[in-house]
């Protein structure tokens, strides 16, 4: 699957990104490189390979679960353009 500049334009528009022509070209190349790598990975024969959750057998030692940050929602929402009932109000992007 290869994207076109029209696809990049649509993605940028939906993401509300304003890209220059050079940025669009660079994004197109990078996205197509990613898709090529994914396609290559999908073609790898994995028959007989046992699925695993983690590449290493050893489990990591985890720290105690304790609060390290305070609730800063009010501070963050104070600078937001619009907040209602502690929710950020954003422009609609997807058509109904």
Swiss-Prot record:
Entries under InterPro entries matching the protein: Asp/Glu-ADT_sf_sub_c (IPR036113), GatC (IPR003837)
Keyword field contains Ligase: yes
Assigned EC number: 6.3.5.-
Biological-process GO terms, alphabetical: glutaminyl-tRNAGln biosynthesis via transamidation; regulation of translational fidelity; translation
Keywords: ATP-binding, Ligase, Nucleotide-binding, Protein biosynthesis
Catalysed reaction, written as an equation: L-glutamyl-tRNA(Gln) + L-glutamine + ATP + H2O = L-glutaminyl-tRNA(Gln) + L-glutamate + ADP + phosphate + H(+); L-aspartyl-tRNA(Asn) + L-glutamine + ATP + H2O = L-asparaginyl-tRNA(Asn) + L-glutamate + ADP + phosphate + 2 H(+)
MF terms (GO), sorted A to Z: asparaginyl-tRNA synthase (glutamine-hydrolyzing) activity; ATP binding; glutaminyl-tRNA synthase (glutamine-hydrolyzing) activity
Keyword Nucleotide-binding included in the entry's annotation: yes
Recorded family membership: Belongs to the GatC family.
Function text: Allows the formation of correctly charged Asn-tRNA(Asn) or Gln-tRNA(Gln) through the transamidation of misacylated Asp-tRNA(Asn) or Glu-tRNA(Gln) in organisms which lack either or both of asparaginyl-tRNA or glutaminyl-tRNA synthetases. The reaction takes place in the presence of glutamine and ATP through an activated phospho-Asp-tRNA(Asn) or phospho-Glu-tRNA(Gln).
Assembly with partners or alone: Heterotrimer of A, B and C subunits.
NCBIfam families: gatC (TIGR00135)
Name of the protein in question: Glutamyl-tRNA(Gln) amidotransferase subunit C
Naturally occurring in which organism (per UniProt): Neisseria meningitidis serogroup A / serotype 4A (strain DSM 15465 / Z2491)
Lineage: Bacteria, Pseudomonadati, Pseudomonadota, Betaproteobacteria, Neisseriales
């Amino acid at each position: 699957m290869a994207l076109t500049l029209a696809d990049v334009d649509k993605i940028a528009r939906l993401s509300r990104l304003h890209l220059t022509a050079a940025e669009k070209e660079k994004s197109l190349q990078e996205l197509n490189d990613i898709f090529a790598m994914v396609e290559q990975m999908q073609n790898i024969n994995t028959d007989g390979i046992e699925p695993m959750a983690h590449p290493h057998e050893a489990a990591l030692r985890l720290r105690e679960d304790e609060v390290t940050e305070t609730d800063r929602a009010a501070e963050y929402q104070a600078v937001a353009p619009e907040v209602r009932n502690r929710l950020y109000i954003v422009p609609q992007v997807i058509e109904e």
